[in-house]
């Protein structure tokens, strides 16, 4: 038979959140299928498919704004270059998200602020996009380190946000 090109979407972690046992299962099964497919002669492409474009981003942005309102990302009149270094570590991110998620379940105003931050991010607000880039860089670096420990690798690091340019045309 002629070799096929097969794309496997496995992994599926959300950025800024730690991996859990469900991600481990998906990673091991997906990596095994990828290797078997390659062993029998197919071109198999592994895609991690990151969750990076939903409410968790708005929650993180909102919590950062509450904790560090002095950051330039939240200054509407800021016109300079945003800092190259992230204003948080992976450990801080892993603490910020559950804190923000808990607040959003108890405080409707906070949840609405996070929903608005998500919307503004998806509309391309510069300060929020800069924060999103920091979140992505810090998270993906940590994810790659963790997947390397599992001997799991991906050919593609596609993410939810990659679909953003196609959404307006699909909605119309």
Where do the language-model regions lie?
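NTP-dependent nucleotidyl-transfer catalytic core
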Residues: 1-172
């Amino acid at each position: 038979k002629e070799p096929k090109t097969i794309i496997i979407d496995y992994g599926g972690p959300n950025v800024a959140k730690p991996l859990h046992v469900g991600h481990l299962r998906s990673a091991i099964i997906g990596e095994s299928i990828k290797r078997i497919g390659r062993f029998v002669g197919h071109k198999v492409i592994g895609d991690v498919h990151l969750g990076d474009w939903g409410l968790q981003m708005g929650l993180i942005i909102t919590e950062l704004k509450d904790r560090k309102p002095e950051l330039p990302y939240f200054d509407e009149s800021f016109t300079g270059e945003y800092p190259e270094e992230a204003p948080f570590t992976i450990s801080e991110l892993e603490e910020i998200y559950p804190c923000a998620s808990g607040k959003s379940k108890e405080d409707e105003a906070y949840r609405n602020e996070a929903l608005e931050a998500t919307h503004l991010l998806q509309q391309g607000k510069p300060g929020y996009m800069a924060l999103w880039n920091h979140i992505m860089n810090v998270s993906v670096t940590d994810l790659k380190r963790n997947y390397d420990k599992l001997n799991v690798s991906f050919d593609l690091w596609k993410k939810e946000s990659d679909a953003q340019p196609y959404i307006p045309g699909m909605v119309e």
